[in-house]
């Protein structure tokens, strides 16, 4: 079976979010399962530099200008690159300029990605043709539409990593992207009077997956679906919508092998984690105190991630003797709020604005609790890293957080199921109650250690996900 992933980023070449982590790990896991898997990406500068052995496959004139299709390898995975410097050779973010304005030609930049994905199924590379084209998020959303226009030369899967980003463009762009105008209607890619790349993926794909079973259910409800609930409910009834949990890349996230940690450890040597905590406290300007539970945030600072709740609950957390270490960037109001809290509580709150992959490992290896209080969370990887590192996740019961973390309730403790702390309602009071439960467990060190071991025992490997995708592909064939 031959599978092509169509997407816009891939860790470690280029990463703006969790999508990159998935594409950095899933194809390799699928290859290990015996599936001939390749990836198609735009040749953004960082990606182009990383695929050093890229050779020309073909050149084409397209609606978006002249392109060269390249093929090379990265970490044992075959990578196709769409080399179109006039579209992709820009510094910084792949999606917007330095002023955070979306590039005005994004409609062409990402329509081209979908078009090439579809053409691959029609022999664009004469030596390799996919049986399944697997597109990810709105950037690749037109892939299933182009396949439909082509008479469906391959089966298509569309994975929703985050339904909030919809890829909306003015309707007149139908003239620019070489899709029939008949596709522009309610039963197609029209949404609120515009073209939606996301809806194109949802409507035309043979099967839709969400990145967790709970998120797959949630997106059939209005509060999570951003207006797509009718279509998603229909796909659910047709058996064409399912949830497959993301995994964790053991090669990158594993406390016993993590070279970014001052001290490596596993579930049988958890006492070594204390040195990581000490070094993290020093690095973040916190008081070195092994008795104070160290809560951490590694996140984009947005209201989706519920970080306003952390700011609101922070006085209660500090009053009980806790510390906070935060690494993240985003909403300027939240950034200012956390910086002000750090200034007001020296030695108790440490804040680093920005994102540093290496430092996120040090936080995961040194903190006691990782906070993930999201309003919605399709899958979430942060809590999975927390589980792997024995850094107990404190999460809201939504999306993938609900599927992966079991609350340390008395029943779950008795049944050996507890792996963290879970709260229900998206408000500071509910969050504070979960924080209180964390303090109570912290006061019982042997019980805390027991829950850490439970957490580290969970299996969220990519092999599990790769197997689930293989079963899905086989059903479609």
UniProtKB/Swiss-Prot annotation:
What's its EC? 2.4.1.21
What is any one GO biological process for this UniProt entry? glycogen biosynthetic process
Record's superkingdom? Bacteria
- EC class of the enzyme, as a word: transferase
What does UniProt give as GO cellular component? cytosol
Quick one: which residues bind ADP-alpha-D-glucose?
15
Reactions performed catalytically:
[(1->4)-alpha-D-glucosyl](n) + ADP-alpha-D-glucose = [(1->4)-alpha-D-glucosyl](n+1) + ADP + H(+)
Q: Which CDD domains match?
A: GT5_Glycogen_synthase_DULL1-like (cd03791)
Q: Pfam families recorded for this chain? A: Glyco_transf_5, Glycos_transf_1
HAMAP family assigned to the protein according to its UniProt record, in alphabetical order: Glycogen_synth
Q: What does this protein do?
A: Synthesizes alpha-1,4-glucan chains using ADP-glucose.
What protein family is recorded? Answer: Belongs to the glycosyltransferase 1 family. Bacterial/plant glycogen synthase subfamily.
Q: What is this protein called?
A: Glycogen synthase
Q: Which organism is it from?
A: Klebsiella pneumoniae subsp. pneumoniae (strain ATCC 700721 / MGH 78578)
Source organism phylogeny: Bacteria, Pseudomonadati, Pseudomonadota, Gammaproteobacteria, Enterobacterales
């Amino acid at each position: 079976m031959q599978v092509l992933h169509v997407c816009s980023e891939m860790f470690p070449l280029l990463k703006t979010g969790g999508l990159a982590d998935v594409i950095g790990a899933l194809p390799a896991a699928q290859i290990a399962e015996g599936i001939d898997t390749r990836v198609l990406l735009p040749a953004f500068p960082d990606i182009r530099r990383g695929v050093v052995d890229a050779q020309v496959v073909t050149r084409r004139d397209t609606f978006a200008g002249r392109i060269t299709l390249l093929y090379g390898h990265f970490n044992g995975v075959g990578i196709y690159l769409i080399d179109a410097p006039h579209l992709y050779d820009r510094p910084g973010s792949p999606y917007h300029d330095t002023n955070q304005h979306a590039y005005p030609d994004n409609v062409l930049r990402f329509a081209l990605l979908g078009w090439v994905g579809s053409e691959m199924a029609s022999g664009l590379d004469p030596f390799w043709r996919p049986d399944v084209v697997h597109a990810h998020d709105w950037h690749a959303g037109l892939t299933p539409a182009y396949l439909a226009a082509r008479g469906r030369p391959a089966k298509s899967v569309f994975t929703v990593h985050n339904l909030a980003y919809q890829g909306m463009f003015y309707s007149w762009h139908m003239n620019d992207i070489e899709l029939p105008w008949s596709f522009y209607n309610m039963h197609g890619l029209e949404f609120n009077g515009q073209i939606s790349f996301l809806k194109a993926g949802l409507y035309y794909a043979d099967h839709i997956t969400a990145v967790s079973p709970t998120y797959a259910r949630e997106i059939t409800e209005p509060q999570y679906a951003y207006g797509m609930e009718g279509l998603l409910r229909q796909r659910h009834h047709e058996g064409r919508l399912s949830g497959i949990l993301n995994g964790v890349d053991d090669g990158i996230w594993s406390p016993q092998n993590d070279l970014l940690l001052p001290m490596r450890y596993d579930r049988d040597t958890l006492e070594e984690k204390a040195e990581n905590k000490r070094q993290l406290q020093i690095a973040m300007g916190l008081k070195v105190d092994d008795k104070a539970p160290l809560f951490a945030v590694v996140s984009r600072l947005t209201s989706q991630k519920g970080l306003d709740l952390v700011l609101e609950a922070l006085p209660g957390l500090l009053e009980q003797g806790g510390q906070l270490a935060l690494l993240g960037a985003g909403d300027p109001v939240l950034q200012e709020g956390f910086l002000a809290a750090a200034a007001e509580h020296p030695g108790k709150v440490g804040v680093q604005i920005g994102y540093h992959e290496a430092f996120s490992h040090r936080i995961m290896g040194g903190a006691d609790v990782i906070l993930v209080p999201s309003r919605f969370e399709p899958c979430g990887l942060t809590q999975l890293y927390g589980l792997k590192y024995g850094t107990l996740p404190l999460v809201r019961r939504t999306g993938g957080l609900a599927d992966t973390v079991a609350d340390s309730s008395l029943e779950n403790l008795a049944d050996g199921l507890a792996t963290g702390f879970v709260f229900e309602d998206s408000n500071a009071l509910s969050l504070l109650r979960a924080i209180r439960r964390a303090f109570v467990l912290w006061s019982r060190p042997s019980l805390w250690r027991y829950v850490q071991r439970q957490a580290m025992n969970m299996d969220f490997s990519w092999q599990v996900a790769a197997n689930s995708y293989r079963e899905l592909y086989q059903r479609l064939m």
